[in-house]
């Protein structure tokens, strides 16, 4: 779909509606694996669907990112051809990808679908050595077991302006990688992996923040950096003010995915934080909303992208909650025709999304 309709920005919508929701649900202490052992009955509801469907699809996207588009397509075609008009199980599905890619897909997928939760990859740099360690990510602390074979894709930025990519499979609890003289390293390039990343040295995050500001990173990566950082805020490991400081790198951000995510995080903080947090979130949210609305327009434009309309709806609603006088004036003006005799479709004038 992305190939034929790139204007739909379908992968941004997938990450926001599927991957992000699955990460949030799977970060709770009480979660469960994608595949329930022994064929145990499971009711599909708002608690289980983000794991079975959203996490399941996201883990498939992780495999696609690790073995590549071509191998993924060939594996899928081979699987469908071999089992046409017949029955097959998930193991045969993984074997199809393993055959065409020569990668241990079955080993990876068994660990990812049979155990609950997902990993947090901690990143510590010492000179030219990157030490990675993994643990289960949860918002609340706990003593959890689990180890995942993590398909890692690293993007390295060298001092001469060149870039390098590395793909490694992290099978154990720790892994050391020689990154040479790289100035910055982005773990989980393209945000294909279903895991959180935490850069323990703020200097390493700052180096990536420069790439955010200069647009050297994709919209998916710009989303992932701040999303993972906010997850650590929610877990109590990072202060909210540190998150706000990192958002300064997004001062000129105009892409749907990072913007709608940042606004959502600020709205969450504004909703449940203490007085100081609420005020700081309102100031930041108001500045972002007013800047972006001035850029994309307060009214829908002919033939504009769906994601632009969705972004406007969310920002208009939240800008009013943040105390934006400009948004309040616009909302009042748009409401007047509706409140009297003129028949105006709210979705065309001031359509507001939910909180």
Language-model-detected regions and their locations in the chain:
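Hydrophobic alpha-helical and helix-loop surface patches within well-folded domains
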Residues: 1-143, 268, 272, 276-295
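Solvent-exposed, flexible loop/coil residues
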Residues: 38, 89, 172, 198-201, ...
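Beta-strand-rich binding/interaction modules
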Residues: 105-106, 118-186
């Amino acid at each position: 779909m992305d190939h034929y309709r790139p204007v739909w920005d379908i992968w941004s919508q997938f990450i926001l509606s599927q991957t992000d929701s699955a990460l949030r649900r799977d970060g709770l202490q009480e979660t469960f694996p994608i595949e329930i052992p022994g064929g145990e009955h499971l009711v599909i509801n708002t608690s289980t669907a983000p794991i079975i469907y959203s996490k399941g699809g996201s883990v498939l996207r992780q495999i696609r990112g690790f073995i590549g588009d071509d191998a993924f397509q060939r594996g899928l075609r081979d699987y469908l051809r071999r089992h046409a008009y017949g029955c097959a199980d998930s193991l045969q599905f993984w074997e199809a990808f393993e055959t065409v890619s020569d990668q241990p897909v079955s080993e990876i997928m068994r660990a990812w679908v049979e155990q609950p939760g997902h990993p947090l990859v901690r990143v510590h740099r010492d000179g030219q050595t990157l030490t990675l360690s993994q643990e289960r990510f949860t918002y609340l602390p706990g003593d959890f077991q689990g180890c995942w074979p993590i398909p890692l894709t690293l993007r390295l930025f060298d001092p001469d302006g060149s870039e390098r990519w590395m793909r490694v499979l992290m099978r154990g609890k720790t892994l050391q990688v020689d990154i040479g003289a790289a100035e910055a390293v982005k773990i989980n390039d393209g945000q294909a992996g279903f895991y959180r990343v935490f850069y323990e040295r703020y200097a390493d995050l700052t180096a990536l923040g420069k790439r955010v500001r200069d647009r050297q990173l994709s919209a998916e990566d710009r989303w992932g950096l701040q999303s993972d950082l906010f997850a650590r805020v929610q877990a109590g490991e990072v202060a909210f003010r540190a998150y706000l400081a990192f958002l300064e790198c997004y001062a000129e951000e105009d892409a749907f995915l990072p913007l709608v995510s940042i606004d959502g995080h600020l709205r969450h903080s504004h909703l449940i934080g203490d007085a100081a947090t609420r005020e700081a979130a309102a100031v930041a949210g108001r500045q972002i909303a007013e800047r972006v609305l001035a850029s994309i327009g307060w009214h829908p434009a002919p033939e504009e992208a769906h994601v632009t309309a969705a972004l406007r709806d969310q920002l208009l609603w939240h800008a009013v909650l943040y105390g934006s006088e400009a948004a309040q004036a616009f909302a009042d003006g748009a409401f007047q025709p509706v409140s009297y005799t003129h028949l105006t479709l709210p979705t065309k004038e001031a359509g507001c999304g939910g909180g």
